[in-house]
Design a protein with these regions (language model features):
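C-terminal edge and immediately downstream basic/flexible tail or linker adjoining helix-turn-helix-like DNA-binding
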Residues: 2-5, 16, 174-195
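A short pre-motif secondary-structure segment
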Residues: 141-145
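Arg/Lys-rich amphipathic alpha helix in sigma70-family domain 2
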Residues: 66-70, 80-100
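DNA-recognition helix of helix-turn-helix
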Residues: 83, 87, 153, 157-183
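Internal acidic/polar
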Residues: 96-120
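N-terminal module of bacterial RNA polymerase sigma factors
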Residues: 1-34, 195
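Sigma70-family region 2
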Residues: 18-19, 56-73, 92-93
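Structural recognition of an alpha-helix C-terminal capping motif at a helix-to-coil junction
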Residues: 38, 52-59, 72-84
Length: 195
């Protein structure tokens, strides 16, 4: 799918939603709720908190949508909104003062059923070990790169990095993992992330 055409499509849906089209709101919800859950579940393991945060995202959109500025990227807007709501809820619940404290354990484990038959248990353990060595921001970066349609600029805004730094980090991460794991294992892993 052409990313530009997809963004254009969602901008049209957003325009229709702002004009009062409830089907457009439902389309936004249906398209993005699973992606938000997947992203949010890597930020927090508190399922009830995550479900409340996702609900708040859509309540806010529904309540304020007609007066909100049209986002350049709806997916970026939703991810950023969810992340902010989760931070706020975690801060209230645990009295965190800095978002970095909450993101120490961004979870980059995936259901690897698709590749388990293709690689050995040893390779799978090595892959998970290598992923666990990454800091939270790098794990989040890999997740966003392969599980979202965000541009490098949008990923950078979400992670407080400039786009060039994002590009370089993705390249370095993949080069490093490829060097440690080999092309075959890494390619299977990356394929599993996209599904």
């Amino acid at each position: 799918v052409d990313p530009f055409a997809e963004r254009e499509y969602w901008q049209i849906i957003w325009d229709n939603f702002q004009k009062g089209d409830r089907d457009a709101f439902q389309a936004i919800y249906d398209e993005f709720v699973d992606a938000l859950f997947s992203y949010g579940s890597r930020i927090t393991s508190h399922r009830a908190l995550l479900e409340d945060a996702i609900q708040d995202v859509f309540i806010d959109i529904y309540s304020y949508g007609p007066v909100l500025r049209k986002p350049e990227s709806l997916e970026y807007y939703l991810f950023k909104t969810l992340k902010n709501i989760i931070y706020r809820k975690l801060k209230e619940k645990h009295r965190f003062t800095h978002p970095e404290e909450m993101m120490e354990h961004f979870d980059l484990t995936f259901p690897l059923e698709e590749i388990e038959e293709e690689i050995s248990d040893e390779q799978l353990k090595q892959l998970q070990t290598e992923l666990n060595k990454l800091d939270s921001k790098k794990r989040e970066l890999l997740f966003l790169k392969f599980n979202s349609g965000l541009t490098y600029r949008e990923m950078g805004k979400l992670l407080n990095l400039n786009p060039e730094a994002v590009k370089k980090q993705v390249y370095r991460l993949l080069t490093n993992l490829r060097g440690k794991m080999g092309n075959g294992t890494l390619n299977l892993f990356l394929f599993s992330m996209k599904n």
